[in-house]
A protein has these predicted regions:
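Catalytic core of pol beta-like nucleotidyltransferases
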Residues: 1-143, 147-156, 164-341
Length: 341
């Protein structure tokens, strides 16, 4: 059976464009993905004789939607009016894929063939550290980002690790927290970096500095390793992908805001993050089943039993089951958020 497409896989098109796969909901003949790098005359990322520039400076719904303008002007075939989600998304048809990059395969290649530069050497020692500290296997890990496509630059590139499966993620998450707390091999943000992180995000989210400090205190999936920024990205296994394209249809119904109590946060580690909720209170007096966030900042920050405030797009969902959900960080959800109350 073919391996299913997964969040954080990368795709190179016949034109040399590089897209990043988003989530797990993909049409049979294409991949839902956003444009990340394009060949250019000038840029910081280089592979062979090809120079790339990054068209999305950071992942945010506004930045993703800005890439649609680039595609509309030159590559309209990569814009798809999705009949399941009832929105326009960027998507790469299978027939236009020159190369499909999988994080686990790339890490396995580096481990097998040896590191080719100082950044890859750091990657190998970091993976060995996690393996030794947690007991997970190499097959539970992968590497995405510029290392995946061999466009990285050791002088400034980050390490973006993928953690495969909920079980491995839960094991690694605890150990990362413990190691960071000991301030040893994995270092957390210092006070200055934490303040800068919060200040920067007050510009993009309707949240206060104090709201963001609380969120930052819950985030575990980042660290510095030997002075290199490292991010950790949980990825579903094939067996954990339980929705096929067309099982449900999603109907946007406008903006909604309110409060709710988290009943289950176990699937909030993935992208999209899914929070099951109860006791919802909105101006529309609706029963809402879940909050679904494509904004990674809101992943795994809420616990069962906690009360949260939210703002996003109300979606009516029909299919195997019928329910309401709130979309955060997706198309049309500018200004959406989740915060603890």
């Amino acid at each position: 059976m073919a391996v299913k497409p997964k969040d954080r896989d990368l795709i190179e098109t016949n034109e040399g464009l590089i897209f990043c796969v988003v989530g797990y909901l993909h049409p049979p003949d294409s991949y839902t993905a956003y444009l990340k790098y394009v060949p250019a005359s000038e840029g910081k990322w280089i592979r062979g004789e090809t120079v790339y520039s990054r068209v999305i400076p950071y992942y945010h719904v506004t930045q993703v939607e800005n890439t649609y303008n680039i595609l509309k002007d030159k590559y309209s075939k990569y814009l798809f009016n999705c009949p399941v989600r009832k929105i326009v998304v960027s998507s790469v048809p299978r027939e236009n894929v020159l190369r499909y990059y999988r994080p686990k395969e790339r890490l396995n290649s580096i481990l097998r063939e040896g590191a080719s530069d100082t950044l890859e050497e750091k990657l190998v020692t970091l993976v060995d550290l996690l393996k030794d500290e947690t007991g997970v296997s190499y097959s539970d890990l992968g590497v995405t980002g510029s290392i995946l496509t061999k466009t990285h630059n050791p002088s400034f590139s980050d390490i973006d690790l993928t953690l495969h499966g909920l079980s491995a993620t839960n094991t690694i998450r605890k150990v990362i927290r413990d190691i960071r707390r000991a301030n040893s091999k994995l270092e957390p943000f210092d006070d200055r970096q934490l303040s800068e992180w919060c200040s920067d995000r007050t510009k993009n989210f309707p949240l206060s500095f104090d709201d963001l400090r609380l969120i930052a205190g819950r985030r575990w999936n980042y660290a510095y390793y030997k002075k290199t920024y490292v991010s950790f990205h949980p990825i579903r296994l094939d067996s954990e992908i339980d929705e096929a394209y067309g099982d449900f249809k999603y109907f946007p119904k406008g903006s909604v805001a309110g409060t709710a109590t988290i009943s289950d946060s176990s699937e909030s580690v993935f992208l999209p993050a899914i929070y099951e909720v109860v006791e919802t209170d909105t101006e529309l007096d609706l029963d809402i089943k879940q909050l679904v966030s494509y904004e990674g900042m809101f992943s795994d920050i809420c616990r069962a039993g906690e009360r949260v405030e939210f703002s996003g797009v109300l979606e009516k969902v029909s299919g195997r089951d019928n329910f309401n959900q709130v979309l955060i960080g997706g198309s049309g959800s500018i200004g959406s958020y989740i915060k603890l109350v």
